[in-house]
Amino acid sequence: MEALMFLTEKRDGTIKGRMVYNGKPTREWLSREDSSSPTASTESIMLTSVIDAFEGRDDMTNDVPNAFIQAHLPKPGDGQARVIMKITGVLVDMLVKLAPEVYGPYVVMENGRKVLYVQVLRAIYGMLQASLLWYKVFRKDLEEIGFEFNPYDPCVANKETYGSQHTVRFHVDDLMSSHKRPKVNDNFHRWLNKKYGSYGEVKATRGKVHDYLGMTFDFSEEGKVKVDMCDYMASMVDDFSIKLGPDDIEKTPAADDLFKEGDDVLLDKRRAEEFHTVVAKGL
């Protein structure tokens, strides 16, 4: 499979680059069972948050950086094939510049282009099975320190600590942890960094307001939690290339022509992709 490089501009104007594995062709032979990772259900996120508010728990959210590469691929053999990634063009130059002694001797020329073939040893972004491999690692590590997983949701785990329940729910590498004692979250944060912080600090958000999975959870009022997606919706509008004004408002999209195809000109590829992205974010 080939490597791809994506450059995106963040909201603060900085440019973020990520080299990923082009896993799209692997859909032909990877089954859903071998590539799909479970994620916490919306019902679980909401119900556990209500419990947090009712019990007056301390909440903490975390993001594990570079989570996927901390999961090893299965070793070749026993039905497992080696995974080879093809790197071409400017990406080869970048790698050679970073570590000439490592990559330089293995660069070859194909059709006038520099090519580098590497064996993939760990899960990387773009692999269909990357999130599942990370899930197995994280679940195993949580179970080793005494967490028991909810039989109805494989991404919610609980542990009895100081006589009270410690709850962790997660969506891939985004976590929310809660316990009545802030000290428990302090210790859990230290454990996360000790376990996964070698590729970047596992940062924590503490306090009464948390931005988690595109939602804002506000525990400021005792015994209650308020959930909204105002910031998420605002970012959708800001990122949309067509700028909307105060008069661009409809009471409902369910007009008489909602399901009529019409004969308008189709969107070009760029705008079609943008349209699909915005619709997907709104679902």
Regions flagged by a language model, labelled:
Residues M1-L283:
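Long, low-complexity, charge-biased intrinsically disordered regions
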